[in-house]
Amino acid sequence: MATFKDACFHYRRITKLNRELLRIGANSVWTPVSTNKIKGWCVECCQLTELTFCHGCSLAHVCQWCIQNKRCFLDNEPHLLKLRTFESPITKEKLQCIINLYNMLFPINSSIINKFRKTVKQRKCRNEIDRSWYNQLLLPITLNAAVFKFHSREVYIFGFYEGSSSCVNLPYRLVNCIDLYDKLLLDQINFDRMSSLPANLQSIYANKYFKLSRLPSMKLKQIYYSDFSKQNLVNKYKSKSRMVLRNLTEFTWDSQLNLHYDLLNNKDKILAALSTSSLKQFETHDLNLGRIKADVFELGRHCKPNYISSNHWQPASTISQCKWCNVKYAFRNMDWKMESMYNELLSFIQSCYKSNVNVGHCSSIERVYPLVKDILWHSITKYLDQTIEKLFNAMNPVQVNDQKVISFHWQIDIALYTHIKMILKTEALPFTFTLHQFNSIIKGIVNQWCNVSELDDLPLCTEQTDTLVRLEEEGKLAEEYELLISDSEDDD
């Protein structure tokens, strides 16, 4: 086990480039960090162990030893983890780059074997070629990769992932890309590598190679917002942002293929990039569709629909003395935009309900309560129109000129009054609402702070470092830019 880690340790002294690239945290002095009881393969050292969340992408893919290097596969520094990373589509040319990388960093020949034999030959018991002392020579070249699926984008991190484990809680899945290359050609490459090994090590090498190179691929797992760590979220002014650490270098490459070309033909550039790299902290907004869905689910779970039957004039989120309407505790960490939406939505529904249904107190038990929760839960789904229509019909609408209408004469907040006028584009509010108007008002309240159709599916921490640098230069990392205020504000 941990053949890749052992190879990084022993091969680091072969060349100057190896000394820089093969310095991984798993072979350094351990700095204790907390684990998350998620067992899987660390994508940096490839050992099967308990994982913790990465500082760069907030996903659980790094072990408690490698975390101290603060490296991420999304960095633009050409460290070993970055060199083993490719984005889809995977081509034969990209796979050849991985094979060339292994052959360059982990060569197997008679001189290398003699070098390790001299290093190991300290006592009589170590004279014989034994697996326990020469595990670093048993690193076959396979095309297995840990794949992160960010919706339409897939990131492949190639490595030698030994052992077996449940992948239920892992953000990635292991796939085998050998069918995209050439099985017989890869077999020949490995036969040539193992030809210099002693006979007893050859059999172990061959067994390892065929065992892993013929593994079937797993079905890819879509990454969701729940896969990301909450430990690096910062709550400022009731608005969340995420702290991200990335390794930067002044050198740039047009593509990953050009980076590998320089690795083979211009090693000085790679060494210069490694020596001049720096660690930079980005503060990115956390406004995305995944978080909105999570917040909306929490809103629906904590919602107290009894408020629509009450006589409370205070905003729904501030009620603290009423046992039927108190949700103040639920908003302690909630985004202020969600709180604003909750207040306006319940205040509007309260006004409509009290105007049309004979109800006196928030202790009343009404059949309409589940529909209020459904409005929140379906606010960003295709079922919102159906739910709004059900809520409208529950308010005893009457038929007027071939249209169903509900009465509207209950008190509302001045800010909500202004907002409804803006949504309906009218100078004065009518005393009745049609289903179309009722639908427009609820959708206007839901979409006032962010247009769900224009939000990214995942947080910005999944973007490449070059993208984060560009967004920071353009001033677009902060949430103020990404609020995506609806066009209704421009209509005043």
From Swiss-Prot:
One of its GO terms (biological process) is symbiont-mediated suppression of host cytoplasmic pattern recognition receptor signaling pathway via inhibition of IRF7 activity. A motif (pLxIS motif) lies at residues 483-486. One of its GO terms (molecular function) is RNA binding. Keywords: Host cytoplasm, Host cytoskeleton, Host-virus interaction, Inhibition of host innate immune response by virus, Inhibition of host IRF3 by virus, Inhibition of host IRF7 by virus, Inhibition of host RLR pathway by virus, Interferon antiviral system evasion, Metal-binding, RNA-binding, Viral immunoevasion. Residues 318-492 are annotated as: Interaction with host IRF3. InterPro entries: Rotavirus_NSP1. It is found in: Host cytoplasm, Host cytoskeleton. Pfam families: Rota_NS53 (PF00981). Coiled coil: none annotated. One of its GO terms (cellular component) is host cell cytoplasm. Residues 82-176 are annotated as: Important for cytoskeleton localization. Residues 1-81 are annotated as: RNA-binding. Residues 42-79 are annotated as: Zinc-binding domain. Interacts (via C-terminus) with host IRF3; this interaction leads to IRF3 degradation. Interacts with host IRF7; this interaction leads to IRF7 degradation. Interacts with host CUL1 and CUL3. Belongs to the rotavirus NSP1 family. The integrity of the zinc-binding domain in NSP1 is important for degradation of host IRF3. The pLxIS motif targets host IRF3 for degradation; however phosphorylation of NSP1 pLxIS motif is not required for its activity. Plays a role in the inhibition of host innate immunity by inducing the degradation of key host factors required to activate interferon production such as IRF3, IRF5 or IRF7. Associates with components of cullin RING ligases (CRLs) including CUL1 or CUL3, which are essential multisubunit ubiquitination complexes, to modulate their activities. This is Non-structural protein 1. It comes from Rotavirus A (isolate RVA/Human/Belgium/B4106/2000/G3P11[14]). The lineage of its organism: Viruses, Riboviria, Orthornavirae, Duplornaviricota, Resentoviricetes.
